[in-house]
């Protein structure tokens, strides 16, 4: 891989650290052991370790020691209509570190028609200058042609990108047709990429938005009313279908509704290689706030797909996350100031979309899923760190506490209780969608690149110390099954003799129409009735057939069939 690292950027001076008496928790096991770190790498794990002098010793006192969190979905320093999101790479990564996350994966969003490579270089420069923790990049495909195809191949082979997002919404801007989705998924499947999808039916959303505005609904409630969860579920089903046909691993971002989550759950049970990503907000809050009398508060919840107005949705999504039907949690952290949100004060379609969640992500999951008994500590590590590392092909460098892994880890205090408020959070946004929530579980100490960056509530993060972590193609976590299926799915024609029977004559099919049959009729023998010819007539109703008296029509055993069933 030819990616060249940044130059003249501050480096974290790694410490020699020894964590003693901790309970190491990985996604597959928990055990008590000491950890010795040097040069940003875990060097030893065990009891009675022999370590050099000058080591800083940290007493974990039996507390959990977990891999640093990986936030697989952020939008930091994102340009939007001449402005940028409230949190740049410095502010956003500080918020992440404060919550126990030691690596983020940001989305590069090229303007339609612009070069993907140029956008990637621009985002890389911003992150190199400001990120306080390690980072990787997804690249969003906002248009599709031969030139873009070549750039995607370059990004995979030379730039360390293995995941690309496409959009099924945002009509006339980013939205792709089914044909384009098929072509993108096919190409990514051949080159070892992960197809990410923003799943909503953009065509119907556009119609519903216009209808809401015509009715005089201009506030944030119009956002959720114009985007019912069925439109998310339909798009997810369509994306799963196309990905299955192209044998490409699919990653559904922002799973916000029960219906969409159910589609993913059913697909996984059928063997589809699909990963679902609920976000911090969909696990921790709901869409009832869109009807708040406070416009600024209501607008702070505007994101797409919208948060579900069904208040039981977060608990439902946490249950599917705990069971493994949903795979990984991102924050989709994308914050705007009140003034920026007010761009859409008279038209909800103009409200900049995005919510906070990078800092709160791990505590929300612990409080809503682990404390409630839905999820154990090992699954907590899987959905906050390990699964993301595996999907991005970074495991076991990231997402695991093991000898040779990066020394990114967290001492997690299961007894800590904190109240979320915008007054003390590390984001620059004035609102926090989790305002007032009392959450159990928080980081007590955070080590990033072998250096303590959070201790006793004090953050010691340095702008520009984050490193770009390249992601290689064909991650086993997704592609082992795909490769096996490709070997079994070779299509072959059926050997048969030449057909030498009669052939009907038809006029050439016109585009957009149906073929016109010639005057020749299909061969029949008199007096046998031609069963291909309809006996239906518009001349009047036929007499109903006579039934013997007393005979009842009953529903067949098992009930009437339902051709709309997803099963």
UniProtKB/Swiss-Prot annotation:
Pfam families: Amidohydro_1. Keywords: Cell projection, Cytoplasm. The keyword DNA repair does not apply. It is found in: Cytoplasm; Cell projection, Growth cone. One of its GO terms (cellular component) is cytosol. It comes from the Eukaryota. GO terms for molecular function: hydrolase activity, acting on carbon-nitrogen (but not peptide) bonds, in cyclic amides. This is Dihydropyrimidinase-related protein 3. It comes from Danio rerio (Zebrafish). The gene is dpysl3.
């Amino acid at each position: 891989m030819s990616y060249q690292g940044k130059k003249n950027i501050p480096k974290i001076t790694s410490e020699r650290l020894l964590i003693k008496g901790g309970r190491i928790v990985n996604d597959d096991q928990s055990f008590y052991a000491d950890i010795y770190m040097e040069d940003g790498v875990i060097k030893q794990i065990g009891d009675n370790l022999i370590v050099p002098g000058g080591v800083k010793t940290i007493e974990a006192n039996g507390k959990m020691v977990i891999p640093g969190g990986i936030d697989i979905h952020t939008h930091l320093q994102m340009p939007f209509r001449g402005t940028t999101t409230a949190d740049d790479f410095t502010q956003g990564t500080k918020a992440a570190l404060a919550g126990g996350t030691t690596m983020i994966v940001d989305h590069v969003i090229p303007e339609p028609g612009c070069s993907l490579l140029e956008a990637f270089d621009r985002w890389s420069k911003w992150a190199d200058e400001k990120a306080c923790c390690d980072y990787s990049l997804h690249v969003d495909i906002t248009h599709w042609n031969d030139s873009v195809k070549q750039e995607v191949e370059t990004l995979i082979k030379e730039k360390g990108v293995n995941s690309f997002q496409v959009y099924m919404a945002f009509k006339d801007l980013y939205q792709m047709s089914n044909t384009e989705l098929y072509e993108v998924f096919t190409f990514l499947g051949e080159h070892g990429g992960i197809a990410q999808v923003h799943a909503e039916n953009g065509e119907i959303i556009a119609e519903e938005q216009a209808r809401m505005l015509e009715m005089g609904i201009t506030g944030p409630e119009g956002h959720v009313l114009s985007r019912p969860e069925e439109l998310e579920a339909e798009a997810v089903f369509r994306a799963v279908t196309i990905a299955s046909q192209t044998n490409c691993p699919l990653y559904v971002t922002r799973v916000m509704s029960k219906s969409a989550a159910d589609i993913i759950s059913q697909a996984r049970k059928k063997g589809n290689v699909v990963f679902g990503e609920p976000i911090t907000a969909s696990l921790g809050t709901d869409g009832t706030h869109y009807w708040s009398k406070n416009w600024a508060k209501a607008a702070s919840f505007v994101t797409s797909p919208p948060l579900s107005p069904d208040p039981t949705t977060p608990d439902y999504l946490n249950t599917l996350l705990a069971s493994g039907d949903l795979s990984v949690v991102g924050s989709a952290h994308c914050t705007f100031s009140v003034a920026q949100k007010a761009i859409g004060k008279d038209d909800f379609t103009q409200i900049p979309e995005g919510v906070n969640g990078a800092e709160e992500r791990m505590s929300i999951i612990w409080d809503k899923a682990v404390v409630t008994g839905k999820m154990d500590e090992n699954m907590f590590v899987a959905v906050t760190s390990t699964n993301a590392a595996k999907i991005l092909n970074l495991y076991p460098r990231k997402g695991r506490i093991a000898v040779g892994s990066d020394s990114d880890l967290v001492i997690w205090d299961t007894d800590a209780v904190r109240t979320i408020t915008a007054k003390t959070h590390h984001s620059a946004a004035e609102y926090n969608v989790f305002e007032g929530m009392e959450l159990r579980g928080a980081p007590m100490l955070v080590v990033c690149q072998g250096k303590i960056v959070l201790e006793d509530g004090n953050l010691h993060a340095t702008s520009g110390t984050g490193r770009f972590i390249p992601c290689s193609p064909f991650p086993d976590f997704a592609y082992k099954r795909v490769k096996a299926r490709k070997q079994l799915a070779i299509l072959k024609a059926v050997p048969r003799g030449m057909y030498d029977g009669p052939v009907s004559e038809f006029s050439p099919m016109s585009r957009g129409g149906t073929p016109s049959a010639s005057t020749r009729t299909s061969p029949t023998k008199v007096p046998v009735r031609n069963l291909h010819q309809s006996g239906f007539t518009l001349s009047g109703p036929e007499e109903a057939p006579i039934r013997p008296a007393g005979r009842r029509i009953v529903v067949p055993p098992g009930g009437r069939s339902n051709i709309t069933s997803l099963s």
